[in-house]
Amino acid sequence: MTLDVSDSKATDLVLTVKKYMTAYSLSCLYSFRRCPYAMRARLGLLFAELPVELREITLKNKPAHMLAISPKGTVPVLQIADGVVIEESREIMEWALEQQDPQELMNPKTLHQGNTLIEQNDQEFKHWLDRYKYTDRHLEMTQTEYRKKGEAFLQILEELLTKNTYLLGDSVTIADIGIMPFVRQFAHVDRDVFYSLPYPKLQIWLKNWLAHPLFIQAMTKFQPWQDGDEPVIFPS
C-alpha cells in the first residue's frame, strides 16, 4: 500500500516521525526557564547555533531520567548525543561554543579575561546575590548591606563598560552571556533601587541584553516535559 502524503494526517505523521528522528540524534538539555545558570547555557547554545532537544522541568517534580544521569538534581544538564553528560552551565556554554562559534565569543584575545570575570561572578558575586535576594534566610546582615557587597562586582563591570559596548570590547564574548543572567537577577530583586544606582553603563548594557533577540528566544516559555511528550527542538 502506498501512503499518500498529500493527505493532511499522513503529512502530520511524517513530520512527527522526522521530528522524533531529529531529536534522537540531538543532545538533550534539561532546563528551568528562570534559573540564571540555565539561561546562560541556553544562550551558549543559541550563539553557537546548535539545536538541542529541550526538556523544561519543574523543580518540585524533576524527571527520573534527569536524576538518573545527574543525581545532583540541578539544572542545567546536557546529555550529548553520544551519552556524555555535562552538569555545569559554564561547561555547557564552552562545549557549545567549541563545536561552533560563528560570532567568536571565545576569541583567544579575550578568553582569559572573560574566564576570570565569570569565575569572579560565580565565586564572589553569586554569594552576595543569593543573600541579597533571600535576606530572610541570611539574617547576619541587612538587605542593603548585602546589596552593597554585591555592588563591588557591579563597579568592576561598570568600569569595563565605560570603555566598550560589551564587557570586553565591541562584540559579545562568553563573559557577557555568562554574567548577564546574574546581573538580571540582582536587578530584579528591586528594579527601582538597581536603576537608581550610579552604574549607567551597566544599566544600559542590561537593558540592551533584555531586548536582545537571542535572549528573548532563550526565555521562550515551554510546558514542563513529561516522558512520552513530543520532542521540543530548541531553538525551533
Per-region residue spans from a language model:
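Acidic carboxylate-rich catalytic motifs and surrounding loops in phosphoryl-/glycosyl-chemistry enzymes
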Residues: I57, A218-P224
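GST-like fold's C-terminal all-alpha helical module
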Residues: L117, N121-A211
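GST-like domain detector, emphasizing the conserved glutathione-binding G-site
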Residues: L3-E151, E158
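Short alpha-helix boundary/capping motifs
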Residues: G73-T74, Q185-V189, S196, E230-F234
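A late-sequence structural motif
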Residues: H212-I216
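Acidic/histidine-enriched, glycine/proline-rich intrinsically disordered or flexible terminal extensions
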Residues: F222-S236
